[in-house]
C-alpha cells in the first residue's frame, strides 16, 4: 500500500502543482500496518480515511477466544490489554512502543507544528492527551515533516478552487476510462461522467493554462458540477450526514498541504459559518458552483 499511495501522491503533485511557482517537494504518507478497512472513496490522491480517522471510536467484540484481545479492535492510538478478570479493554499505546519509521515519507506534521515519526506515534500521543485542551486541539495537519508553508495570497486563493475543480474533473474522467470491470464508479456515476468524458474528448486539443482557468470554468461550467458533488460524497463517510469534519477532510487535505500551500486557507474559508463543519452548500460555493445547482441527490 505504501508504494500505491506514493504513486498516487506523485500523480496528484504533477496534476495540482501551480504553474506559476515551483512544485513543493512531495513529502508523503502516513502508513502503519492496521487491519484492512473498507475503502472510502476512489479519488487516487485521497488516502484511506482509516489512516487519519480520529472520530471512529467503536471497540468491536466478537466470539471469545483464548486471547480475548485477538478479536477486540481498538481505534488508532490504543492497544488492547486484559484486566484482572481477563476482560479486554483498550488503553493508550505508549509512543515508545511504536515501530521506528523507515523514511521521511512516514513522518507527519501535527497541528501543534510538531513532527511525529509516524501515524502510530501521533495517535498514541493524541490518546495520552485525551480529555485535555491540548488533546482536543491536536489533529493531523499534513503528511511529511513539518516545514515552512508560505502564506496563501489572495490572488493564489482565487485560482486554487479552479485548479482543484479541474483536477477533480480529470480524476473522474480517468476513473471512467479505466473502469471496465473494476467497479471504480457505480452505474449512476458512470452515466453522469459519460457526458463529461465525451466533452473532454471534444476539448482535448485545448487544455487550459493557469491564466485560462477562469475562462474554461465559465465556458464549461456544467462539467464541473458533478465532480464537486462527487468529491464531497467521497469524504462524507463518518458519519454520512451532509457535513465534512476536520477528520473527514484529512484524507484529501493532508496529502495536498505540502504541495499546495493554499490548502489550509481554502478549507478554512469554506467553513463560512465557522462551525468547524463544511456543509454541502458551503463546499459547492467554495468551488464556484451556483446555489441553484447544488443537489444532494447528485451525491450517489
From Swiss-Prot:
GO biological process: one example: regulation of synapse organization
Residues annotated as domain Kazal-like: 86-148
Signal peptide: 1-17
UniProt keyword list: Basement membrane, Calcium, Copper, Disulfide bond, Extracellular matrix, Glycoprotein, Metal-binding, Secreted, Signal
Binding site for Ca(2+): 271, 273, 275, 277, 282
GO CC entries: basement membrane; extracellular space
Keyword Signal: yes
Cystine bridges: 69-80, 74-90, 92-127, 98-120, 109-146, 152-262, 270-286
Domain called Follistatin-like: residue spans: 68-90
InterPro entries named in the record: EF-hand-dom_pair, EF_Hand_1_Ca_BS, Fol_N, Follistatin/Osteonectin_EGF, Kazal_dom, Kazal_dom_sf, Osteonectin_CS, SPARC/Testican_Ca-bd-dom
Molecular function GO terms recorded: calcium ion binding; collagen binding; extracellular matrix binding
SUPFAM superfamilies, alphabetized: EF-hand, EGF/Laminin, Kazal-type serine protease inhibitors
Function: Appears to regulate cell growth through interactions with the extracellular matrix and cytokines. Binds calcium and copper, several types of collagen, albumin, thrombospondin, PDGF and cell membranes. There are two calcium binding sites; an acidic domain that binds 5 to 8 Ca(2+) with a low affinity and an EF-hand loop that binds a Ca(2+) ion with a high affinity.
Recorded family membership: Belongs to the SPARC family.
Name of the protein in its database record: SPARC
Protein species of origin: Xenopus laevis
Amino acid at each position: 500500500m505504501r508504494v500505491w499511495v506514493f504513486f498516487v501522491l506523485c500523480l496528484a503533485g504533477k496534476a495540482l502543482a501551480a504553474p506559476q511557482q515551483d512544485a513543493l517537494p512531495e513529502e508523503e504518507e502516513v502508513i502503519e500496518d492496521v487491519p484492512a478497512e473498507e475503502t472510502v472513496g476512489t479519488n487516487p490522491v485521497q488516502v484511506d480515511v482509516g489512516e487519519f480517522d480520529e472520530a471512529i471510536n467503536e471497540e468491536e467484540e466478537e466470539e471469545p477466544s483464548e486471547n480475548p484481545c485477538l478479536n477486540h479492535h481498538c481505534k488508532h492510538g490504543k492497544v488492547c490489554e486484559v484486566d484482572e478478570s481477563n476482560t479486554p479493554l483498550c488503553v493508550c499505546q505508549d509512543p515508545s512502543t511504536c515501530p521506528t519509521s523507515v523514511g521521511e515519507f512516514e513522518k507527519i506534521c501535527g497541528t501543534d507544528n510538531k513532527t511525529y515519526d509516524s501515524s502510530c506515534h501521533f495517535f498514541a500521543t493524541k490518546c495520552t492527551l485525551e480529555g485535555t485542551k491540548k488533546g482536543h486541539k491536536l489533529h493531523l495537519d499534513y503528511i511529511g515533516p513539518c516545514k515552512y508553508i508560505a502564506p496563501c495570497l489572495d490572488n493564489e486563493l482565487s485560482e486554487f478552487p479552479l485548479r482543484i475543480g479541474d483536477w477533480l474533473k480529470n480524476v473522474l474522467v480517468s476513473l471512467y476510462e479505466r473502469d471496465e470491470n473494476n467497479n471504480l464508479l457505480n452505474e449512476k456515476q458512470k452515466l453522469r461522467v459519460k457526458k463529461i468524458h465525451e466533452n473532454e474528448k471534444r476539448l482535448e486539443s485545448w487544455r487550459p493554462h493557469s491564466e485560462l482557468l477562469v475562462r474554461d470554468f465559465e465556458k464549461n461550467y456544467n462539467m464541473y458540477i458533478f465532480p464537486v458533488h462527487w468529491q464531497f460524497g467521497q469524504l462524507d463517510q463518518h458519519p454520512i450526514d451532509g457535513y465534512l469534519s476536520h477528520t473527514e477532510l484529512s484524507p484529501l487535505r493532508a496529502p495536498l498541504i505540502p504541495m499546495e500551500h493554499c490548502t489550509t486557507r481554502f478549507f478554512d474559508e469554506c467553513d463560512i459559518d465557522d462551525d468547524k463543519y463544511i456543509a454541502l452548500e458551503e463546499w459547492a460555493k467554495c468551488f464556484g458552483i451556483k446555489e441553484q445547482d447544488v443537489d444532494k441527490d447528485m451525491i450517489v
